[in-house]
A protein has these predicted regions:
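Core alpha/beta nucleotide-donor-binding catalytic domains of modification enzymes
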Residues: 7-9, 15-153, 162-167, 171-174, ...
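Short aromatic/basic micro-patch
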Residues: 113, 155, 321-324
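C-terminal target-recognition/interaction regions appended to catalytic cores
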Residues: 3, 262-379
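Short Gly/aromatic-enriched secondary-structure transition segments
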Residues: 78, 224, 313-317
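Class I S-adenosyl-L-methionine
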Residues: 99-107, 119-298, 302
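Short, positively charged and aromatic/hydrophobic N-terminal segments
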Residues: 1-2, 10
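Proline-centered helix-kink/hinge sites
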Residues: 114-115, 153, 200, 334, ...
Length: 379
């Protein structure tokens, strides 16, 4: 995990000095299939969690799409210098539904952390048309378009909330798997937890990895964590014994401005609500953590409202919210040298709450790429 002092944080776009060595640092060797660079597209890109994870594995971004204007600001501030072609060629799009499919170049891996939406239950066909009107339908359209043109993506790499597995009584996930199967892909999925990938956050997400059926070695084995020496872990016994241990203190700043400390009024409100929930017999209410806590609860996009899901203990003071830098670290962003916050605290909390945990995606991506390269070597 990358930890820097607070004074290394820059709330502004990257300078030439900062970006001079970025290519070497985060993408030392561009991976290739044959004589062509390995490529991906970044849909529902947010602030670039997938982009950092893929680029650190030596994969080149060919196209990205994000509609939120503040997320676009953060994405552009962090990638314009290191991926100039993406912006110079107009390949950083807004609303993906407004994009002409011909404007999306061929690519090897499709990455998308897409919103969870219900599909039509009409007829329960679980086919391509059942997804019409949803954002997943657009993903399916892009895949189908490239397949029809003779450029089938090699891998589809998707992320969603854990609840997708049971959303609409399992119908939503069934439809996604059925559509990918219809498009020529063998599907694997698994719920993974960021706390097992070196991030001190209890954050469960479902990942879907799909390979072309004609690939003879298309079964994908998910890493379920990383060990202390940063090697992927694939079974539960190793996860229990070898997983990289984390603590919340790893991501905390030494000095945080007073404005992040809860006001007396807000803190008393939290205490009242927690007591009320306790009397009702449930565990709702604010969650308090300290430097020795192994991990926090899940940071969400609503964290900016009152911070109640993750509060940090302070000696002799009321608890405080996370600083935006800490929120970035909690998601594994390389804050400081390689990542910069260019929006308000409110927007930053939303952005990090909506993002993927970078080390988790990084580890899965590494396994995907290793298998792709191995398969290519045996062709």
């Amino acid at each position: 995990m990358i930890v820097v002092e607070q004074d290394l944080w820059i709330q502004a776009p990257m300078t030439e000095e900062v970006t001079a060595n970025i290519m070497q640092d985060i993408a030392p060797h561009t991976k290739s299939l044959g004589n062509q660079p390995l490529t991906f597209i970044d849909l529902f890109a947010g602030i670039g969690g997938f982009h950092f994870a893929m680029r650190s594995n030596g994969v080149k971004c060919m196209f990205a799409s994000e509609w939120d204007k503040f997320a676009r600001q953060t994405y552009e501030a962090n990638f314009r210098t290191i991926e100039p072609e993406l912006f110079a060629k107009g390949r950083f799009a807004g609303d993906i539904n407004a994009v002409n499919l011909d404007d999306i170049p061929p690519f090897d891996i499709l990455c998308a952390g897409f919103p969870c939406q219900p599909f039509s239950n009409a007829g329960l066909k679980k086919g391509f048309e059942d997804t019409r009107g949803t954002l997943f339908f657009r993903i399916a359209q892009i895949i189908k378009d490239k397949c029809d043109k003779g450029y089938p993506p090699k891998v589809i790499f998707l992320e969603n909330v854990k609840g997708l597995a049971h959303h609409d009584k399992g119908h939503t996930l069934d439809v996604i798997c059925s559509v990918l199967d219809e498009l020529g892909y063998r599907v694997a999925y698994r719920v993974l937890n960021a706390k097992n990938f070196g991030v001190p956050q209890n954050r469960e997400r479902i990942f879907i990895v799909s390979w072309r059926k004609e690939n003879p070695a298309s079964t994908f084995h998910f890493p379920i964590g990383i060990s202390a020496d940063k090697k992927p872990i694939f079974n539960d016994e190793e996860l229990k014994d070898l997983v990289l241990k984390t603590r919340v203190g790893d991501i905390l700043l030494h000095n945080v401005e007073g404005k992040y400390t809860l006001s007396e009024r807000l803190y008393q409100g939290h205490l009242r609500r927690k007591e009320m929930h306790k009397q009702k017999g449930n565990g709702f209410g604010f969650s308090l953590f300290n430097a020795d806590s192994p991990y926090t609860s899940t940071i969400s996009a609503r964290y900016y409202k009152d911070g109640s899901e993750i509060l940090i203990e302070q000696t002799g003071k009321r608890p405080r919210k996370l600083h935006p830098i800490e929120a970035a670290r909690l998601q594994g962003f390389p804050i400081g040298k390689h990542f910069h916050i260019v929006v308000s605290d409110t927007q930053a909390y939303k952005q990090f709450g909506n993002s993927v945990a970078v080390p988790m995606v990084q580890t899965i991506a590494s396994q995907i790429i290793e298998q792709l390269l191995m398969n290519t070597a045996h062709e």
